[in-house]
């Protein structure tokens, strides 16, 4: 577990109950910065193990991280812990998160972790926990599915934590007039970098930095328009794509005609032409193509418009 500094502990149940009953808990505000003038909040993220089988068991919580901050988003403490689990980890999960089985086998058990989470939230008098996406649902399903043997005390604590959690994806997506965006995309359009670590604490800190940027500085209208265009074109591209592998027994004549059409389609700068071109390419050559990443798309759009958007690390 990682922490910056820790206040003296108080009564967990009493203070979390007090925070839950605050009027501000039930209010939806599109500007968290305003709440921070008088309250402490946390930004939280989780990592969870999902089944690779369609219709398989619910996701299992294996890591939790959060950052607590006050006025002007100033951090006061950080917390991170893995949660003990004996499950076998599939390759994709390990590649994305960097979590290895030994990390979970040596981690504290679920009850210890969640009680420590509650103690930290109570110690800093956190009034609200903000997440982006399904974290609340994952914690809730995990509690019902995998934590049947935990104590009543821990179960009550986790349920109180759940009542403190608010998913702000919908609120801030509406604020930015975006259908939906992940942490990685938001980092890019806010100029906060391009990498997403898939580490619970790092992603919680990224979320805090993104919301701070949106609330205090706002997002570039140019970047938001690119994001909207990217989302729309990506949806059309994958809706039009039909083929994912090379066709067998394609005659030389058809291949030559298709390659000729590919050259012509390369001159047409539309998403429909790109989808058809990529279908023909994979059918004839087996070369699989995908839609550009947001970062690649932004670079291309900036070349068109002559704009230069520098990364925060550029000097």
Residue ranges and their predicted role:
Residues 1-57, 69-77, 102-315:
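DEDD superfamily 3′-5′ metal-dependent exonuclease/proofreading module
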Residues 60-62:
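Short coil-to-beta strand junction motifs in C2/discoidin
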Residues 64-68:
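Short beta-strand scaffold segments in enzyme catalytic cores
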Residues 73-97, 101:
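Short, surface-exposed acidic-centric catalytic microdomains
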């Amino acid at each position: 577990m990682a922490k910056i500094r820790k206040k003296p502990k108080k009564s967990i149940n009493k203070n979390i109950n007090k925070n839950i009953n605050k009027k501000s808990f039930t209010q939806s505000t599109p500007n968290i910065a305003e709440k921070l003038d008088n309250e402490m909040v946390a930004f939280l993220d989780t990592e969870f193990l999902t089944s690779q089988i369609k219709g398989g068991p619910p996701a299992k919580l294996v890591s939790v991280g959060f950052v607590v901050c006050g006025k002007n988003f100033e951090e006061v403490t950080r917390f991170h812990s893995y949660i003990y689990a004996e499950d076998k980890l599939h390759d994709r999960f390990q590649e994305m998160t960097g979590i290895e089985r030994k990390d979970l086998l040596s981690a504290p058990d679920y009850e210890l972790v969640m009680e420590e989470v509650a103690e930290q939230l109570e110690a800093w008098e956190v009034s609200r926990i903000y997440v982006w996406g399904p974290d609340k649902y994952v914690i809730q399903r995990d509690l019902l599915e995998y934590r049947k043997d935990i104590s009543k005390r821990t179960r009550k604590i986790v349920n109180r934590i759940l009542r403190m959690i608010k998913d702000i994806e919908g609120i801030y997506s509406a604020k930015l007039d975006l259908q939906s965006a992940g942490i990685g995309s938001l980092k890019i359009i806010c100029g906060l970098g391009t990498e997403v670590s898939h580490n619970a604490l790092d992603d919680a800190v990224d979320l805090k930095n993104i919301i701070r940027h949106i609330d205090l500085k706002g997002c570039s209208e140019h970047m938001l328009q690119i994001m909207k265009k990217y989302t729309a074109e990506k949806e059309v591209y994958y809706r039009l794509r039909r083929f994912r592998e090379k066709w067998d027994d394609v005659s030389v004549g058809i291949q030559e005609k298709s390659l000729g059409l590919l050259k012509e389609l390369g001159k047409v700068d539309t998403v429909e032409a790109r989808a058809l071109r990529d279908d023909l390419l994979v059918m004839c050559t087996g070369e699989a193509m995908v839609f550009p990443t947001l970062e690649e798309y932004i670079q291309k759009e900036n070349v068109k418009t002559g704009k230069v958007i520098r990364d925060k690390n550029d000097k």
